[in-house]
Amino acid sequence: MENVTDRTSNPFGMRPACESPCSERSEAAFGYGDANADFHVIGDYPGIHGGRETGVPFTERPAGEAIQRALFETGFASEPYGDAPELENCFLSYLHMCCPADGEPTAESYANMERFFDAELRAIAAHVLLPVGERAMEYVVDQYTARLGRIELDMAKLHASEVRGSGFLVVPIREPTDWEEGDGQRLIDSLLAIRGSDYRRTADLSRFLGTDELYFVR
C-alpha cells in the first residue's frame, strides 16, 4: 500500500499533547522524510539527536550530522547535511518527538508518546529499522523482534550488524557521539550491502489493528 501525500514533515498529521513547544519555530520534531520509505531511522528525542529549532529529527547536533552524512554516502540524502534534508526511501523519527520543559523525558512521558510512534511506524511500514542509541534499540528489540533478554544490548558490538525481527530487518546504530574510528564507514558499508540485497520481508502488523483482522505487508 502506497501512502499518497506531498508532506515531508509530519505526513500523517500526528498531534501529541506536548507540554511545551520545542522552540518558537517548531512545536515538536515530527517524523520527516519519504512516507513510503523502506528504511526507517529511529532516534530518541530532540535533546539528544537534535531538532529543537528546525523541528526535523537528526538536525543541529553532531549526532544528527553523523547520521545525515551516512545517509548521503548511501544514497538516501541529496547532500551531506541539511536542516530540511531531501530524502529518498528513508524516514526519520523519534520515540519521543516532544521537548519536555524540564529536559529529559520521564518514563511516563515516553509511555504517553508510544502510541504516536507506533502509529507512524505502522503507517510507514518500512522493511529496515535503524534504531540509533541504546534506548531506541531496546524499544525496537522489545516491540519488533520479541528477542529482548536474548540479545546483549552492547551497541559497540551490535553497531551496523543485522538483527532479524518479526518481519523487520533491524540494523542497530551506536550513539554517534560514541563512534570510534571506522564506525561511520561500517554503517555506510552495511547500508550499501543491504540496499543491494533483497531486504524486503513480509511483516505481520496485525497487532496494531486491535481486531482479529490479519495485516501483512511486504
Predicted regions, residues:
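A polyanion-binding, active-site-adjacent surface
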Residues: 2-218
